[in-house]
């Protein structure tokens, strides 16, 4: 166990070791480690899930780190093909083309590139593209679709290899993966080795302010090492000679920020949005201990409310299933103490997940076609970040008397007569 999990000694952003304890979820299985029928129910390994925040730079982080090979060697998260996500990815392509004038032949590199879906959109706009992803199965899918992808973590060595083979990159970026990387300094070493002097680097990360404000405790799981504010990212990037020049909000994954940085010597205008967001973070109390204590109190209350609502529905003789089987859904079920006794199944469109079993809760994952033959009275909307899109697509379920339980920011029941 000591070989694969260890407590962190210092903040991965600023190097200090002055921690404020925020919340503990005890020891839980890996939320993304889906099981097969052959897996022994008693054989799941439990890992501590404790959250702390650095009092120096206000990075929120897990207190323990699990070896990435254990977490991501055969990763089953496939980038969503939901319409809202595709639209968002297209907007990012357009923004980058406009922001730095990407032209045919320029090099774009994405780390944590998953199946290459976003790079494919960049390629359609003209640039050359290369992906980097440590999940060998997903890198294989990307290569099969014609998006060159290196099956590795993004490091200085990998950055140098790409630069040698393809030249320097005008754009290097990572979407919704930066929080998954324990050694973020090594990633930034890779950026420094690869980024052209006039290039841009960006990361898209779930936004800590939204997590705290909207009780998004289910986004806290072992695969997410870090929870970033703009302030903590500014501190991190400055230590690598990068200056934050722009920031955008994105209504994806519960609320995210897209943070652009450039070499400090580059002639990139710093947009007013940077100072505006930093000021807003101060006003939201991101650097005040009370903010994190209040989040912990709300988390405890909302977990109990979700548990009591679901168990009350089941006690009334109604059936409940999960809608979606995202990693955060597994984390929510574990945090609320819900399992197969309350939740009959989870319906998910991801083929790689179908036929598997959620860790800890032991809830089977079915395809939508299989679920259609066992329509529950209630769906617990585990993929709540797509709630408007899902509810709009499931009008027939609601019109036939079905109900959705939307758990975050606090549980509420949606019927044909009610709205979000």
Swiss-Prot record:
InterPro entries attached to this UniProt entry = Methyltransf_Zn-bd_dom_put (IPR013630), Methyltransf_Zn-bd_dom_put_sf (IPR038576), MeTrfase_14 (IPR013691), SAM-dependent_MTases_sf (IPR029063)
What EC designation does it have? 2.1.1.-
Q: Which UniProt keywords apply?
A: Antibiotic biosynthesis, Methyltransferase, S-adenosyl-L-methionine, Transferase
* Superkingdom assignment: Bacteria
Q: Which GO terms describe its molecular function?
A: S-adenosylmethionine-dependent methyltransferase activity
* One Pfam family named in its UniProt record: Methyltransf_14
Q: Which GO terms describe its biological process?
A: methylation; novobiocin biosynthetic process
Q: In which pathway does it act?
A: Antibiotic biosynthesis; novobiocin biosynthesis
Give additional notes from the record.
Answer: It is unclear whether NovU acts before or after 3-epimerase NovW in the novobiocin biosynthesis pathway.
What role is this protein assigned?
C-methyltransferase that acts together with NovW to catalyze the formation of dTDP-4-keto-6-deoxy-5-C-methyl-L-lyxo-hexose from dTDP-4-keto-6-deoxy-D-glucose in the novobiocin biosynthesis pathway, an aminocoumarin family antibiotic that targets bacterial DNA gyrases.
Member of which family? Belongs to the methyltransferase superfamily.
Protein name (Swiss-Prot/TrEMBL) = C-methyltransferase NovU
The organism named in the record is: Streptomyces niveus
Q: What is the lineage of its organism?
A: Bacteria, Bacillati, Actinomycetota, Actinomycetes, Kitasatosporales
Q: Give the gene symbol.
A: novU
